[in-house]
């Protein structure tokens, strides 16, 4: 059985809006070295395939991020935020049954494509929703449908 997902413009717009918040951030992947051991007073480093998202570049200040957010809000006729809430606490609000899971998986793929980010935390309110998200990732909703459109 092959699943076919209908692409909705508002889902793509939401993913684009999140990515646009970080406009000016270069594409970078980030691996790092880990201290593995000390022998005879010398520290030995070994290349370790560890991953993290590259930090936000200093040029992308909180003021610039807030300006990007306000521009997006104005374009959507949403009251502009007065200040950032925490360090980049972004919310996409959608009605039930309109494809939130698809939208944030699409957003993850877009953030990876634009900025090289590869680590994300998905927080859900219940076990049932977690299992649904897990299943969506298992059937490769993101890979099967996002890659066709990205």
Predicted regions and their residues:
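RecA-like P-loop NTPase motor core of helicase/translocase proteins
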Residues: 1-149
């Amino acid at each position: 059985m092959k699943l076919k997902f209908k692409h909705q413009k508002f889902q793509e717009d939401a993913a684009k809006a999140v990515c646009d918040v970080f406009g000016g951030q270069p594409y970078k992947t980030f691996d790092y070295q880990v201290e593995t051991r000390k022998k005879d007073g010398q520290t030995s480093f070994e290349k370790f395939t560890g991953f993290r998202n590259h930090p936000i570049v200093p040029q992308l200040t909180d003021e610039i991020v807030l300006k990007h957010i306000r521009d997006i809000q104005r374009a959507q006729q949403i009251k502009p935020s007065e200040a950032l809430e925490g360090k980049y606490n972004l919310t996409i609000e959608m009605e039930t049954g309109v494809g939130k899971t698809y939208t944030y998986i699409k957003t993850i793929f877009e953030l990876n494509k634009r900025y090289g980010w590869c680590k994300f935390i998905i927080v859900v309110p219940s076990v049932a929703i977690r299992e649904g998200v897990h299943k969506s990732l298992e059937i490769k909703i993101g890979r099967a449908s996002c890659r066709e459109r990205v």
